[in-house]
Amino acid sequence: MSARFTVKKLGAQGDGIAETESGDLFIPFTLPGESVTAARERDRAALMAVLEASLLRIEPACRHFTECGGCALQHFEAEAYRQWKRDKVVHALKGIDCSIDELVACAPHTRRRVVLAARRSETGMLLGFNRHLSPEIISISECPISLPEIVAALDRLRALADLICATTKSFRMAVTVTGSGLDVAVYESGKLGEHQRRIASNFVLAQGFARLSIDDEIIIEPRKPVVMFGSVAVAVPPGAFLQATEAAEQAMAEIVGTHLKRAKKVADLFAGCGSFALRLAAKSEVHAVEGDAAALSALDRGARFATGLKRVTGERRDLFRRPLTFKELNTFDGLVFDPPRAGAEDQSKQIARSDVPFVAAVSCNPVTLARDLRILIDGGYQVKSVTPIDQFLWSSHVEAVALLDKPRRRRG
């Protein structure tokens, strides 16, 4: 049953929040000050109509907005949206003495990697994103966050999903734009028979895709998918982690590189395929530490075949179970760490005890970043600046890069 509500503020996930007698009510796709009708179910409600619109409401960029759950904030005026994103970092770091820069904006049509949901239905193959907080898949024909190469291939990717589908359940298709073409990594689509493998392989060849892998097994690889990290070409493994946009990666690399420019020997923790390590190696020796063997192998190959780099070494290590100790860290004079959303609490405790003079912390979660920064501050580090980066356009997520140093008097 629908009722009328007045939205008071935006929540952390970008939902509008209305205050009711029974507590806060979360209404997606609404803005502060709006009067709306919505169908309530416990503490959430589905938007039915906007009765009085905010002056900050704009036309969304995509026809699928409000059905597709991929974006939360296309209806929010650009400047107000950017301020809200920056404020997420400000609020998370409340109580930490630091300068927070303006948000680094990222343009539409720049996301190079998307994870699509797929499922065979009675009407055909669905390929797109899940509806907001729902397992239902909204099949898409456009996507204004994604690179044009992905959007132009949606029909062909849908056809490929149909060819490889061997399950009645939904499955995932990660699509990455590389210098060699589209890298398609599929997960949980079911076991392929030999006939299906041949048909899928022929389709990939005909469509010019660089690679098809299923559950990390390479089905066919006409060309190795290559990504540039600065001047270094890296052949990335199936399902490799990459920053969402190349522009955001470049912005982060420049911020980190400037901070660590005086370091002669740098540690890159949670190094992935080398997006920081291989750029930093242009000026510094780098020791890259990463838990994923395939990613570390890709980094190593990229370094070995590159020219003009300082020495690059690699170490496979689970930094959650076995963080580098402060004694190990003391052999470096610069450090960057870029952990998953959970942050790097145990590793931060070791960094805090170390004498590394220059540290850069990269995070996609301001809450865990705040926790890790507090650990470093308590260990004698000073936060020089924090830069929010909007690489997850129109979502509630925001990246941030924090730069720290430890004054000489606080070392040892």
UniProtKB/Swiss-Prot annotation:
GO terms for molecular function: 4 iron, 4 sulfur cluster binding; metal ion binding; rRNA (uridine-C5-)-methyltransferase activity. Its EC number is 2.1.1.-. It holds the Pfam family tRNA_U5-meth_tr. [4Fe-4S] cluster binds at C62, C68, C71, C143. S-adenosyl-L-methionine binds at Q243, F270, E290, D338. SUPFAM superfamilies: Nucleic acid-binding proteins, S-adenosyl-L-methionine-dependent methyltransferases. The active site is at C364 (nucleophile). Keywords: 4Fe-4S, Iron, Iron-sulfur, Metal-binding, Methyltransferase, S-adenosyl-L-methionine, Transferase. Gene3D superfamilies: 2.40.50.1070, Nucleic acid-binding proteins, Vaccinia Virus protein VP39. CDD domains: AdoMet_MTases (cd02440). Belongs to the class I-like SAM-binding methyltransferase superfamily. RNA M5U methyltransferase family. This is Uncharacterized RNA methyltransferase mlr7480.
